[in-house]
Amino acid sequence: MDWRVLVVLGPILIAAGWAGFNIAAAAIRQVQGFFNKEA
């Protein structure tokens, strides 16, 4: 692996992981709210 590849991909992977984490957390909250309404 070339260090320049890591320099370019590192921030992109961090941003993608952070976005995915936030999307998953929001989706879980929505699902929990849905089940709470159904109960």
UniProtKB/Swiss-Prot annotation:
Keywords: Membrane, Photosynthesis, Photosystem II, Thylakoid, Transmembrane, Transmembrane helix
Membrane topology: Single-pass membrane protein
One annotated GO molecular function: manganese ion binding
Subunit structure: PSII is composed of 1 copy each of membrane proteins PsbA, PsbB, PsbC, PsbD, PsbE, PsbF, PsbH, PsbI, PsbJ, PsbK, PsbL, PsbM, PsbT, PsbX, PsbY, PsbZ, Psb30/Ycf12, peripheral proteins PsbO, CyanoQ (PsbQ), PsbU, PsbV and a large number of cofactors. It forms dimeric complexes.
Family statement: Belongs to the PsbY family.
Role noted for this protein: Loosely associated component of the core of photosystem II (PSII), it is not always seen in crystals. PSII is a light-driven water plastoquinone oxidoreductase, using light energy to abstract electrons from H(2)O, generating a proton gradient subsequently used for ATP formation.
Listed name of the protein: Photosystem II reaction center protein Y
